[in-house]
Each structure stands twice: as C-alpha cells, then as structure tokens.
C-alpha cells in the first residue's frame, strides 16, 4: 500500500475506538430503548430469559471476526487455535452438564438443530411422529408450513380432550399403525411431565429413533428440576437460551457413537458453513454458569414460581390448561372470560407485562387470534422474583384481563396505566444490568 492510498491514522483509530453511540446513534438508541423495556417490564414469554453480563461480553467479543469451518482440530482455515479452545470448552461443559457422551455446539438455532437430525436420520418422504402444534408441539415437529412437514410425512399425536394430557397408550397405538422412522417428544406449550422411558419403549417396539427436543425445559434438566431425557433418547436437542439462560442457539446431544459422523456432517457441511464462534464462546460461558450449585436453586425456583403464578390465576377464576404446571410455563384458557389471546396480549403489554397469545388444545380460533395466553417464569425468576412476587403478578394479570373483559373495545386505559405503575415499582426492586 502506498502512502497516498493508505487511510489516515485517525480514520483507522476511529474505526477501532468509536463507541456504538458515536458510530451509529440510531442503532444505539434502539438498543437503549430495548434495555429500558427489559428493565421496566415483567417478561413472561416462556421462551425468553435474561443472560448474564458475562454471556453478553463473550457474544460481543473478537470471536465474531473468526471463520472456523469444520470442527476443533479439523478446520478449513488457519488461525483457529483459540476458537478451538472455546469450542472444546463448550463441548466438554455441555457433556458434563447433561451427562451425555457427545455434543455438537454449532447449531445456529433450534430449527437448524432439528433439521440436522432429520438430515442425519431420515429421507424425504419418511414418516415421523411429533406432538401436534395445536396441542403444544412446535413448528419443526411437522407443521405443514415448516420444512419438517413439507419434506417428510408427519403423523401427529395429541392430548386428551378431558385433561389435556398426552395419552401414551394412544401414542403407542398410533406408532403401531404408522410405523414411524422417528418419534419426537417435546414441545413449546406442554406444561406436564414427559414419559421419556415409555416413549423409548414405544420407539424400540416399532423400530424408530427417539428424538427429545428439550428446548423449553433444558435449564430445568440441567438444574435437576426436571427428569433428563439423555438416558432414554437416541438424540436430544435443545436451544441454549430459554430456561438454560444462554445465548440464542442450538445444541445436539447423544450417547451412541454411531450417530457422531451423521450428526456432525449434517450440521457441517450439510446445513451450515462457518460456525458462529462468538455465540459458541457465549454458550460455553452459559454452560459453566449452569454447572454451578446456584443454578440448581434457580431451576427449582422457576418451577415453584410457575406453580405459584398458575395457582394465583386459578384462585382468581382463570382456567389453566391441564389444571396447572410442572415446569416453567402454563397456558391460560381465556374462553370462560370471553376474551381472545391477541386482545389480551396487547392489553397486558400496554400494562408492562410481556407475554404471548397462544393456541390451546382444540382451539377454534386462528393462530393470530387464539383462545389462550402462554406465560413463563424463567426471565422474571432470573431477576429475583419469588413466590410472593409471582402471586402479585397473577393479581396484576387478573386486574387487566377482568377489566378488558368488561370493555367493548378490549382496552381499559385507566386500569392498564395503574397496573403499569405497579409493574414499574416491582421491577425497580429487581434491577438488571446496573
């Protein structure tokens, strides 16, 4: 580079030293606004959480600069000695955390981790079974709008109408009839325990693989507050955020070496190129946090808080699907109140309580309307809420929903404003990122 073509030193210095606020004030303002929202609203979306400052720091590190196609010790690029350290730490910690023999920490998302299992084990057109989305399953478990439902033949099992629980005898009978190559246990809105042992017995009986997608309850498994699927499933997948409280991403676990080459090859080069090394570094940090004794207390508190919230709502006349919860989430059936999920979600958001509309089993409403709300406790538990606070949250939710049930337009501005002030007072007692 000649002297005339070189950038002035001041320009280079600015590139490496300018703060985000200096370099891009518009994005800085959006981030500041989101921080304010998280600080002053009660987060009840079951799939969200609040990560540690250490996880944020790892994810915002210079690891973002590095391409590292391949796996530790077998990369397609040079200069990977330090990202190898980070990925090996993530792998070792994941295996220790969940008691698995093998782990792949490279999936960029929950969808991609499940796609990798399909790619590794199935051929297009093969039959598999998963919980119906309307009964609490997930898009990647065979929804007709998802790749899993377009490329493969999905046979969905569901829940009973009377108690909204999975009927394992019905699952066994269906498996006998459809002879799936894969059975998936796991979902996004099922609040009761999964019988992993029985699922494996059914899978073995019909010659199917068992995949457990524990994306929602992995943090509870890690903390000993939920049964582990690892001893029973052929393959276990999970996201690394949600109740596990790490960065957004995926993880695949298995015990039998016969799956190693298939699964690793399905992720790279099958679905992904260069892994996101800054995210993998953050995953390693989160796994280390989950290995500490205090994480067991956190997981136990999530479940206790969920039970307290569900009971608080039940005591105030709200119907909880299946009658309660044994994990971190619950579904509120709004039909007895004459409410819809979309209207209720918006009213609660205006009052400073973030949640999401959700279909309930056998819901007559469309997915963007719904008859229910999904509520979860991981994020507010992270910031320190306990049983007493969640009982109060239940009362605040009831206050808003009862008010809008009496309002022709689905809004109650005075009540929403009053509840928002109470929410602000509550969240101020439990600050984040100070």
Curated annotation (Swiss-Prot):
GO terms for molecular function: glycine hydroxymethyltransferase activity; pyridoxal phosphate binding. This is Serine hydroxymethyltransferase. It is an enzyme of class 2 (transferase). InterPro entries: PyrdxlP-dep_Trfase, PyrdxlP-dep_Trfase_major, PyrdxlP-dep_Trfase_small, Ser_HO-MeTrfase, Ser_HO-MeTrfase-like, Ser_HO-MeTrfase_PLP_BS, SHMT-like_dom. (6S)-5,6,7,8-tetrahydrofolate binds at residues 133, 137-139. It comes from Bradyrhizobium sp. (strain BTAi1 / ATCC BAA-1182). Its cofactor is pyridoxal 5'-phosphate. Keywords: Amino-acid biosynthesis, Cytoplasm, One-carbon metabolism, Pyridoxal phosphate, Transferase.
């Amino acid at each position: 580079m000649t002297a005339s073509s070189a950038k002035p030193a001041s320009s280079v210095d600015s590139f490496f030293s300018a703060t985000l606020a200096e370099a891009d004030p518009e994005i800085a303002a959006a981030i500041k606004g989101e921080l304010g929202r998280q600080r002053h609203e009660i987060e009840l979306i079951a799939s969200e959480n609040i990560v540690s400052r250490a996880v944020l720091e790892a994810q915002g590190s210079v690891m973002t600069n590095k391409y590292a196609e391949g796996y530790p010790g077998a990369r397609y690029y040079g200069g990977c000695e330090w990202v190898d350290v980070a990925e090996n730490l993530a792998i070792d910690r994941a295996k220790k955390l969940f008691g698995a023999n093998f782990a792949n920490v490279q999936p960029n998302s929950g969808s991609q981790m499940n796609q990798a299992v399909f790619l590794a084990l199935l051929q297009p057109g093969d039959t598999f079974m998963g919980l119906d989305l309307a009964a609490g399953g997930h898009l990647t478990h065979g929804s007709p709008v998802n790749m899993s439902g377009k490329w493969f033949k999905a046979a969905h099992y569901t829940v009973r109408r009377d108690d909204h629980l999975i009927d394992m005898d019905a699952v066994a009978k269906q498996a006998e009839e459809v002879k799936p190559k894969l059975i998936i246990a796991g979902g996004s809105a099922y609040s009761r325990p999964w019988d992993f042992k029985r699922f494996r017995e059914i899978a073995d009986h019909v010659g199917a693989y068992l995949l457990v997608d524990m994306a929602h309850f992995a943090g509870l498994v890690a903390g000993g507050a939920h049964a582990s699927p690892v001893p029973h499933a052929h393959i276990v997948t999970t996201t690394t955020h949600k109740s596990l409280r790490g960065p957004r991403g995926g993880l695949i676990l298995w015990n039998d070496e016969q799956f190693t080459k298939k699964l690793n090859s399905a992720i790279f080069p099958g679905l992904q190129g260069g892994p996101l090394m800054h995210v993998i570094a953050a995953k390693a940090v989160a796994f280390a946090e989950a290995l500490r004794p205090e994480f067991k207390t956190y997981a136990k508190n999530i479940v206790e808080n969920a039970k307290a919230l569900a009971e608080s709502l039940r005591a105030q006349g709200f119907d909880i699907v299946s009658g309660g919860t044994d994990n971190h989430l619950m579904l509120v059936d709004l039909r007895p109140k004459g409410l819809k999920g979309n209207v209720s979600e918006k009213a609660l958001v205006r009052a400073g309580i973030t949640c999401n509309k959700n279909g309930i089993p056998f819901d007559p409403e469309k997915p963007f309307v719904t008859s229910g709300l999904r509520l979860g406790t991981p994020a507010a538990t992270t910031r320190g809420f306990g049983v007493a606070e969640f009982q109060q949250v239940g009362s605040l939710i009831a206050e808003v929903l009862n008010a809008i049930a009496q309002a022709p337009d689905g809004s109650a501005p005075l009540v929403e404003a009053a509840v928002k002030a109470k929410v602000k007072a509550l969240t101020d007692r439990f600050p984040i990122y100070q």
